[in-house]
Amino acid sequence: MTACIVGWAHSRFGKLEGETLENLIVKVATDALDHAGIGPDEVDEIVLGHFNAGFSAQDFTASLVLQADDRLRFKPVTRVENACATGSAAVRQGIRAIDANAARIVLVVGAEQMTTTPGPEIGKNLLKASYLPEDGETPAGFAGVFGKIAQAYFQRYGDQSDALAMIAAKNHKNGVDNPYAQMRKDFGYEFCRQESEKNPFVAGPLKRTDCSLVSDGAAALILADTATALKMRRAVAFRANEHVQDFLPMSKRDILTFEGCEQAWNRALKSAGVTLDDLSFVETHDCFTIAELIEYEAMGLAKPGEGAKLALEGTTAKDGRLPVNPSGGLKAKGHPIGATGVSMHVLTAMQLVGEAGGIQVPGAKLGGIFNMGGAAVANYVSILDRIR
């Protein structure tokens, strides 16, 4: 692969009062160009990741990126969508443009504004990332979908509530030191483990602390070909970038194995010529704690049904053998859908150049990313390596 990350920007995630989707997009696009030291006239292509699905009345959003600078006018811009993996779909589109020699420098932006939407509509919008004939009437929205997955996992492998609480507590603890995170509070294991008025059950065995947040936010990357990147201030290369798409209906697959996730990881590791033991850390898609648990198994870190051991033994803690979600993950950082995949790449690049501040993994050399759309339907894995 020839694409490298040479600059980035990241907004705070959360309920951003007074912000608009346009402002979020413009700010990160401008800041990313400045961070890379790239002029708008040097950009060859632009990709915007924006899920929307009813969150914004402005559905045609591609050209909002051009508002960042008049010199971007007439540049080709494409908006992409692939459910909660929309951001990674945008990143991949940019990589492919560079790998095909169709572009030298690509601006990638991911953004979403969700918190201005009334609560009941949020659930309906998110369910659009499921197979509606089967799941369209699921109570509790997408939490209900993953509640069913968690219940099925418990039935097959036993009650895993201790492990889910440990995952939630880990990610909240990590998120305290992330300045971009929506929820910077260490709730602790006991709070996450116990049902309470402040932590009620939401769907099946999933409590509030098992669910990611509804968020506003944006992130951006500047991608460049390797020759250009090596002349820049910094360069983080894609050792691998893989995309695997699975069936949408859960009835057509074993939903407890996340086979698309497994396939994407296998292909990425083979492409990069590395193993999980070579990775310094992983940012993975913890839309719900049960998702992170199953992802441990799908990526090959644990055998089926044994992912809980990793959480309970501290293997995936920040000081563990393979830190998972040192950023706090979607659980603490927030999950503005179109921005999430781009954010994961920004924060991984920051780790690799030693600019991650309080969430820095000491000596990070190689970072893995898994971003998922739907219930393991759209699956993206990147492996990043600093080369400058």
Protein language model features and the residues they cover:
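Conserved active-site "lid/cap" helical segment
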Residues: 1-85, 149, 153-160, 182-192, ...
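Condensing-enzyme catalytic core mediating Claisen C-C bond formation in acyl metabolism
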Residues: 1-22, 132, 165-167, 200-263, ...
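Conserved catalytic cysteine-centered active-site region
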Residues: 4, 52-109, 113-145, 184-213, ...
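Buried hydrophobic positions in well-ordered alpha/beta secondary-structure cores of metabolic enzymes
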Residues: 6, 32, 43-46, 87, ...
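Beta-strand segments within the central parallel beta-sheet cores of soluble alpha/beta enzyme folds
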Residues: 41-50, 76-82, 106-110, 162-169, ...
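Short glycine/threonine-rich loop-to-helix capping motif typified by GTGT followed
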Residues: 53-61, 250-254, 286-309, 320, ...
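Active-site-proximal alpha-helical scaffold in enzymes
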Residues: 81-112, 144-178, 221-227, 333-356
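Extended C-terminal subregions enriched in glycine
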Residues: 258, 262, 266-290, 298, ...
